[in-house]
Design a protein with these regions (language model features):
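Pol beta-like nucleotidyltransferase catalytic core
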Residues: 1-55, 59-87, 93-191
Length: 191
C-alpha cells in the first residue's frame, strides 16, 4: 500500500477514468457469477434483442475471451464493448461497488441498476443508463438502441465527465480518516 500518494495522484486517476474510451468492437457485455438480485437475466434478455451480449462470467456464459485472451483482466476485456450490463447485487441507499467504476474505467457505457442517489453526487448520473427493476425501461432500451446505431451520439455520451471533481476531496477525506483511525488503534495496542 502506497501511503505517499497525493490528492493530485487521485485527480490523475479520475482524469484517466473520465477520458477512457471504448474500442467499440462489440455491443455489450455482462460479467457476473450469479443472478441473486433477479435482474441480470432480465436485462440480458432485453438488451439481447438489440445486439449480441457476451457473458464471460458463470452466469449465462457464452464467451471465453476474458480468460483466454485477456488473462482475466476485466478492464481490458470490457474496453472492447460499447455497453456493460452491471447491476449491483442489491439496491440500497449508499451501496455501490466496483461494477459501475469498472465500466467507466474501461470506457464503456454502464447499463446500471443500483442506488439512484449515488452518495454526494460523486458520479455524473447522466453518464450511465439506469435500468430500474420492476419498472418500465422502454426509454432505456430505446436509448441503448439509439447510441448503438449512431456513433456521433455514442461518442458524445461517452465523452461526458463520469466522475465529478468532488470525488477527489471525498476520497482524500476517507483516506485521512482511515489512516487516523489506524494510528489510533495501533497506539491503543501499544499502551
Amino acid at each position: 500500500m502506497n501511503l505517499n500518494y497525493t490528492k493530485n495522484d487521485i485527480k490523475k486517476v479520475i482524469d484517466n477514468i473520465n477520458n477512457a474510451k471504448s474500442k467499440k468492437n462489440k455491443f455489450a457485455s455482462l460479467v457476473a457469477s450469479h443472478d441473486i438480485p433477479k435482474i441480470r437475466t432480465e436485462i440480458f434478455n432485453k438488451i439481447s434483442k438489440i445486439g449480441e451480449v457476451k457473458c464471460a462470467g458463470k452466469l449465462l456464459h457464452n464467451d471465453d475471451t476474458l480468460k483466454n485472451e485477456f488473462n482475466n483482466n476485466k478492464i481490458e476485456y470490457l474496453r472492447d464493448f460499447k455497453f456493460n450490463i452491471c447491476p449491483e447485487n442489491t439496491i440500497s441507499d449508499g451501496y455501490i461497488t466496483e461494477k459501475l467504476f469498472d465500466s467507466f474505467k474501461a470506457g464503456c457505457i454502464p447499463i446500471y441498476s443500483g442506488d439512484e442517489n449515488i452518495e454526494l453526487d460523486l458520479v455524473n448520473k447522466n453518464a450511465l443508463l439506469f435500468y430500474r427493476k420492476g419498472k418500465d425501461n422502454s426509454e432505456v432500451l430505446k436509448e441503448v438502441e439509439r447510441l448503438n446505431k449512431d456513433d456521433k451520439l455514442f461518442d458524445a455520451f461517452q465523452n461526458q465527465i463520469k466522475i465529478n471533481d468532488s470525488m477527489v476531496d471525498y476520497l482524500w477525506d476517507r483516506r485521512e480518516k482511515i489512516l487516523n483511525r489506524l494510528e489510533e488503534l495501533i497506539n491503543e495496542r501499544l499502551k
